[in-house]
C-alpha cells in the first residue's frame, strides 16, 4: 500500500473528454488519458485490501492493488509487467472495458471507487511510448500446430499465449481484417483501429500467422451475421492439418425482440448498422443503412446502443 491515508486525502479524478462541439467533427478518440502525476495520485487511493475484491471483479483477474502501488511509486516498468502478466491487451480493456473491477472496489462502498480502468490505460500507453512492449517469441519450438477459429479478442489472446510457449499458431478469420467486434462493432471514437494493427504486428513478430477472409465450416450462417469471407475450409481439414483447434467465435447472432412493429422497414439490429459503418469509415464501401436527416431511436443503453446513437449524430 503506497500511501496509507491516500484514500482519505485524494478524490477520484476521471479521464477528461474533448468538448462535444469538437468531437462531433471527427470519428477519432476523444478521451485523454491521465497524466503521470494524476495516475500516481489515483494509485495512492488504493487501500490494498486484505481481500482484494477488485481482483475477483476483473474478468481476467488483474492484480490490481500491485500495479496501483507501483504506479504510486512511479515504478511504471514493473507496473506494466504486473499488468501484462494477466492481460494480453490492456490498451483494449483500458479503453472499452465496463470496469466491473471498480464496481467491486471496497472504497466504492462509501466513496468514489479507485479509477482502476484509467490507471490501466495510463500504464499501457506509457509502456508503448517507452518502448517496453515488445514481441516475446518463444526460444524453443514444440513442433505442434494449433488453429484458432475466430480472430476477435479471445482468438488473438489465445494465439499470442500459445505462440509464446512455442506452438505454431494460425488464426482463421472470416472478415478481411483481424479484430472481430473490436474492429467492426466498436467505433473509432472509443478505440482507434491502429491499436489493433499494432498488436497484430507484434503477434506476427512472435510467429502468429493470420488467414483472413476464410470461413470455417460447412453450414450457412444466419442472415443477420455479416460474412465477408472469400474462402472456405472445412473443420475436418483443420483437424487433419493441425494438432489442436481452438474455437473462439464471437457472439454475433442477435436476439430478436418479438414486439409489434418489429417487421417494419427501418428496424435494424445494432450490428447490421455498426459493422458496415465501421467498414465505410475504413474506406471499404458505403453503408446502405443511412441515418442522415432521419429521426432515430435505440432500444438499448449498452455500449452498442450508445455507439449506434453517436454514429447517427455524426
Locations of regions flagged by a protein language model:
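Residues forming the flavin
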Residues: 1-37, 42, 120-298, 302, ...
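Iron-sulfur (Fe-S) cluster-binding segments and ferredoxin-like electron-carrier domains
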Residues: 3-28, 53-78, 100-126
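Catalytic cores of large soluble enzymes that bind and process phosphate-bearing ligands
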Residues: 28-35, 46, 59, 71-72, ...
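Immediate flanking context of iron-sulfur cluster ligation sites
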Residues: 33-53, 76-100
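C-type cytochrome heme c attachment motif
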Residues: 45-48, 56-57, 103-104, 170
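Short beta-strands and strand-loop turn motifs
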Residues: 49, 61, 98-100, 181-184, ...
Amino acid at each position: 500500500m503506497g500511501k496509507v491515508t491516500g484514500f482519505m486525502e485524494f478524490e477520484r479524478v476521471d479521464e477528461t473528454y474533448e468538448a462535444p462541439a469538437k468531437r462531433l467533427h471527427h470519428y477519432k478518440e476523444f478521451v485523454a488519458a491521465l497524466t503521470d502525476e494524476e495516475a500516481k495520485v489515483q494509485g495512492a487511493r488504493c487501500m490494498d485490501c486484505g481481500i482484494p475484491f477488485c481482483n475477483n471483479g476483473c474478468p481476467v483477474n488483474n492484480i490490481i492493488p500491485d500495479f496501483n502501488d507501483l504506479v504510486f511509486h512511479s515504478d511504471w516498468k514493473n507496473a506494466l509487467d504486473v499488468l501484462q502478466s494477466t492481460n494480453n491487451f490492456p490498451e483494449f480493456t483500458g479503453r472499452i472495458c465496463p470496469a466491473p473491477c471498480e464496481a467491486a472496489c471496497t472504497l466504492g462502498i462509501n466513496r468514489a471507487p479507485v479509477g482502476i480502468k484509467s490507471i490501466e490505460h495510463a500504464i499501457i500507453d506509457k509502456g508503448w511510448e517507452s518502448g517496453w512492449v515488445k514481441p516475446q517469441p518463444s526460444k524453443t519450438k514444440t513442433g505442434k500446430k494449433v488453429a484458432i477459429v475466430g480472430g476477435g479478442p479471445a482468438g488473438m489472446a489465445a494465439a499470442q499465449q500459445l505462440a509464446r510457449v512455442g506452438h505454431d499458431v494460425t488464426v482463421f478469420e472470416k472478415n478481411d481484417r483481424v479484430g472481430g467486434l473490436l474492429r467492426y462493432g466498436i467505433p473509432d471514437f472509443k478505440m482507434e483501429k491502429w491499436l489493433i494493427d499494432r498488436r497484430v504486428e507484434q503477434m506476427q513478430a512472435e510467429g502468429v500467422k493470420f488467414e483472413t477472409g476464410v470461413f470455417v465450416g460447412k453450414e450457412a450462417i444466419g442472415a443477420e451475421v455479416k460474412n465477408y469471407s472469400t474462402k472456405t475450409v472445412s473443420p475436418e481439414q483443420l483437424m487433419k492439418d493441425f494438432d489442436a483447434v481452438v474455437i473462439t467465435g464471437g457472439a454475433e447472432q442477435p436476439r430478436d425482440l418479438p414486439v409489434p412493429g418489429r417487421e417494419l422497414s427501418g428496424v435494424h439490429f445494432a450490428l447490421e448498422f455498426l459493422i458496415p459503418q465501421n467498414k465505410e469509415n475504413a474506406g471499404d464501401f458505403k453503408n446502405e443503412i443511412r441515418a442522415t436527416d432521419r429521426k432515430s431511436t435505440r432500444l438499448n443503453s449498452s455500449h452498442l446502443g450508445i455507439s449506434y446513437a453517436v454514429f447517427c449524430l455524426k
